[in-house]
């Protein structure tokens, strides 16, 4: 069987979502590890006055592509930016571009999607379902297409606790929903959305389930594969550890925790934190397309790209590793020392949110107003709480994903491909991964220089000393109040002080005897 780089040699690839986190990493990996690929057609829309070519060039100039630039300086010649708007009829392709794509494309990687959990249903259907259907219809016209690779989500069927590598029946017929949305106004759509999505937490998950069914039904005559990643996080190894460039998903919460703003949130400490590194998702996608292209399986291949069943990791551990990582390598100008703790009990959660989030925010804003500055902390906390609501469903529940196809795929790789396209998450060391993830948020999201670490540590130590001093003064004041009113409290106070004095005297005497 040919290797993965050999399979992609001379191939023309069509990629959607190249400006997104996953799409960027896939583009970089494809060009670096399969250097003999012929060309990559990247569907990109105009945005903020930038042409598709300018947007692609901006991506290629980023740090993500540093390694590729060193290894293959001429890689840009293989990338062809094509003006396309996935939400428009026929993808808004020009006739010339459409003809080139139809004649040349061998493999499609469909990574584009709206990943906003609070997206309104109409827009989510437009990009996640209708755009996918239009791309399938375009693929049916392609003369040399070998594989259609669709990137979905492992949570598409989160209404089930055990999820196999199959496409389940949709919650509603996508065609009927699309037809209905055409005559509904926005108010009506918003009113019926909760009833439509039912036991799914948001429109993103709901529409990704519909998209899978569209791919299965409309692409019945195509060679289709679906990869379902769980919570996509920073890179594990490639192109370098800890690569992340956005605030989406856990990254924003990690940064809020590192800044000392996030102190508590709803999560079950024993629930599985099914994080999967972005490079594992990319490697799985490239390998899955290779397998389908070489073996031409009769049925659609679905791959649950998850970690929980093979290398379980829990939210309680996430909190512990976050606290340790950000105390060792703090972010610049943290608000408080990093310490986040998860609660599943409603009473405890609301109590600590009030004590650790709301009250400090109000006090800081009051101080800012008194000094003539603009208050900002309470707005930040409010936005943080809204973001937490969208993630609580995933931090409070666990699922079991069947990964037989992923295991089969791993066994099909030759020794060299297993190294180059590593998908074996059993080798993943979570403490090291979270540490690199935290460092990645510092370097690549917040753009903080590593040379500033000594100053950041000094600032963190200063905050620690202030906290210790404040707590000491608070304890003394409380005890003084009780001592002034109670003989019993005075007796307890003097007893404790006496014990401390005796302990210190004994410690001093023991130290002297040793020498």
Swiss-Prot record:
Compartments, record wording: Peroxisome membrane
Catalysed reaction, written as an equation: a long-chain fatty acyl-CoA + 2 NADPH + 2 H(+) = a long-chain primary fatty alcohol + 2 NADP(+) + CoA; hexadecanoyl-CoA + 2 NADPH + 2 H(+) = hexadecan-1-ol + 2 NADP(+) + CoA; octadecanoyl-CoA + 2 NADPH + 2 H(+) = octadecan-1-ol + 2 NADP(+) + CoA; (9Z)-octadecenoyl-CoA + 2 NADPH + 2 H(+) = (9Z)-octadecen-1-ol + 2 NADP(+) + CoA
Transmembrane segments: 466-483
UniProt cross-references to InterPro entries, sorted A to Z: FAR, FAR_C, Far_NAD-bd, NAD(P)-bd_dom_sf
Residues in compartment: Peroxisomal: 484-515
UniProt topology in membrane: Single-pass membrane protein
Record EC number: 1.2.1.84
UniProt keyword annotation of tRNA-binding present: no
Highest rank taxon of the organism: Eukaryota
Annotated segments matching region Necessary and sufficient for PEX19-mediated localization into peroxisome membrane: 451-507
Keywords, sorted A to Z: Lipid biosynthesis, Lipid metabolism, Membrane, NADP, Oxidoreductase, Peroxisome, Transmembrane, Transmembrane helix
Task of the protein: Catalyzes the reduction of saturated and unsaturated C16 or C18 fatty acyl-CoA to fatty alcohols. It plays an essential role in the production of ether lipids/plasmalogens which synthesis requires fatty alcohols. In parallel, it is also required for wax monoesters production since fatty alcohols also constitute a substrate for their synthesis.
PANTHER family: FATTY ACYL-COA REDUCTASE 1, MALE STERILITY PROTEIN 2-RELATED
Protein name in the entry: Fatty acyl-CoA reductase 1
UniProt lineage: Eukaryota, Metazoa, Chordata, Craniata, Vertebrata
């Amino acid at each position: 069987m040919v290797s993965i780089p050999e399979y992609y040699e001379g191939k023309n690839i069509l990629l959607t979502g190249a400006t997104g986190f996953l799409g960027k990493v896939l583009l970089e990996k494809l060009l670096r590890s399969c250097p003999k690929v012929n060309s990559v057609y990247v569907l990109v829309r105009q945005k903020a006055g930038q042409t598709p070519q300018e947007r692609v060039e901006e991506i290629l100039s980023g740090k993500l592509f540093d390694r590729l630039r060193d290894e293959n300086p001429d890689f840009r010649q293989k990338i062809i930016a094509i003006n396309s708007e996935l939400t428009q009829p026929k993808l808004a392709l020009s006739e010339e571009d459409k003809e080139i794509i139809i004649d040349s494309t061998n493999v499609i990687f469909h990574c584009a999607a709206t990943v906003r959990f609070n997206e309104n249903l109409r827009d989510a259907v437009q990009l996640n379902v209708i755009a996918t259907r239009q791309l399938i219809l375009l693929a049916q016209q392609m003369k040399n297409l070998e594989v259609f690779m669709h990137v979905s989500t492992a949570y598409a069927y989160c209404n089930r606790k055990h999820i196999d590598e199959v496409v389940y029946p949709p919650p509603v017929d996508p065609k009927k929903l699309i037809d209905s949305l055409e005559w509904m106004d926005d108010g009506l759509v918003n009113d019926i959305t909760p009833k439509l999505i039912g036991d799914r937490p948001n429109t993103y998950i709901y529409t990704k389930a519909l998209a899978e069914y569209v791919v299965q039904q409309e692409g019945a005559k195509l060679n289709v594969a679906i990869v379902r990643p769980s919570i996509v996080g920073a890179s594990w190894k490639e192109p370098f550890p800890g690569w992340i460039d956005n605030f989406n998903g856990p990254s924003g919460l990690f940064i809020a925790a590192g800044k000392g703003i996030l102190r508590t949130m709803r999560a079950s400490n024993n629930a599985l934190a099914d994080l999967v590194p972005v490079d594992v998702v990319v490697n799985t996608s490239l390998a899955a397309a290779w397998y389908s292209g070489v073996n031409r399986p009769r049925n659609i291949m679905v791959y649950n790209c998850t970690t929980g069943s093979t290398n379980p990791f829990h939210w309680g551990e996430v909190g512990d590793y976050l606290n340790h990582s950000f105390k060792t390598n703090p972010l610049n100008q943290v608000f408080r020392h990093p310490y986040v703790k998860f609660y599943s009990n409603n009473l405890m959660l609301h109590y600590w949110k009030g004590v650790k989030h709301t009250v400090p925010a109000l006090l800081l804003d009051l101080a800012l107003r008194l000094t003539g500055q603009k208050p900002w902390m309470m707005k930040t906390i409010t936005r943080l709480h809204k973001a937490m609501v969208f993630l609580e469903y995933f931090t409070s529940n666990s699922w079991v994903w069947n990964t037989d196809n992923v295991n089969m795929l791993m066994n099909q790789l030759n020794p060299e491909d297993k190294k180059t396209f590593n998908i074996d998450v059993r080798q993943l060391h979570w403490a090291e991964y979270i540490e690199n993830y935290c460092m990645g948020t510092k370097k690549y999201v917040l753009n903080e220089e590593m040379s500033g670490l000594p100053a950041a540590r000094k600032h963190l130590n200063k905050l620690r000393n202030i906290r210790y001093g404040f707590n000491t003064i608070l304890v003394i004041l409380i005890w003084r109040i009780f001592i002034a009113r109670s003989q019993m409290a005075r007796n307890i106070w003097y007893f404790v002080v006496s014990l401390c004095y005796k302990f210190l005297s004994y410690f001093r005497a023991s130290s002297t005897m040793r020498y």
